[in-house]
Amino acid sequence: MQKFFANVCSPSLRRDSSPCVCFCVWIVVAALAVSSHLSAQAKPVGRQQNVGDAPSASLPLAHDLSGKLTHRDVRRAMRKVANWQLNRAESDFDQDWTYAALYAGFMAVPDEADGKKYRDAMQRMGQKFNWEPGPRLAHADDQAIGQTYLDLYRRIHDPAMLTPIRARMDAVMQLPDERDKPLWWWCDALFMAPPVLAKLYTITGDRKYLDFMDREWWITSSLLYDSKTHLFFRDATFLGKHEANGSGLFWSRGNGWVMAGLVRVLAEMPRDYPSRPKYVTQLQEMAAEIASIQGNDGLWRPGLLNPSAYPLPENSGSAFYVYALSYGVNNGLLDRARYLPVIEKAWAGLVSHIYEDGRIGCIQPIGAAPGDYTATASYVFGTGAFLMAGSEVERLAR
């Protein structure tokens, strides 16, 4: 904890000369931001987002799927989940972060698993919103949809797909520099905005996007990353919180989003970028910790360091771990011999939670900390995480 107090009050991250004032201001700002953030997300959740909560007995698990790492089995699982979610969600597409994760998952589905079908749906989605991000200028949640816009732009090269999200990020980069109010104050934001900036760099060749992303990433990391556990606190209000067993409170889903953001940034970052080794090191540190606390069923509980307190796995976080670990192995960043057994066990665990209709269960609803949910709870962002995981597992199977 001393590391975090020191970082929060570091002269490079604040203007106030008083450490106590700096820390108190940061905690108050973060607490208010959390309240505002959750309030903004508290709108009624439609059936396309939350489709769970039915008794498990009335929803039989799928019997036509296998968790084996073969092309045939991985693609079949991806199709089943993607088809079910697309059929339910397309009439209710949204610009918010929950759907942005789903869209990234649809974009990741390989051609061999009917990827074009889902990309075509994403093109229809983008046209529906005129390729605009969400309404909040500086909020990373409303920028995350830009990942899909930019991935489509790289295939189709229609300027309409690029211009609005580029203008949004240009505007964000012109906001006043308030180092005592980090732009990305919650760890999930590292999935939302950084990949957009990294993709803009790749597309435009303008390094300002990558440099801005790099600066903001390490400001957030210095505040929320625990160098002892190699995990991220959800936000500054969690720095002093503990599980019932005395361990720090580290949220599975939040850390999953961070690891997914890490690999999506690394996918765009040049190998000679000066700070790239820091991202690789952070991925390797987090991967080692995550592998060491994997559950017997291959999955991870909502509170990472007190798994016995949570009866169900949390599959959106678990899927993002599979995605990041598989990407690391596929790209030579993580040792195959060490992590392949972890991935195999985790993928089989995820597939075991797919129901006959195609939904994937055990997904915690919107929140900011470990919470309760049913085995059938299913949300669009969890589906997106599963499809992203499948895309890398399918590569691994090759």
Task: Indicate residue ranges for each PLM-predicted region.
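Helix-capping and short linker residues that terminate individual alpha-solenoid repeat units
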Residues: 90, 114, 130-134, 157, ...
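N-terminal secretory signal peptides that target proteins for export/translocation
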Residues: 1-20
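Bacterial N-terminal signal peptides
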Residues: 22-35
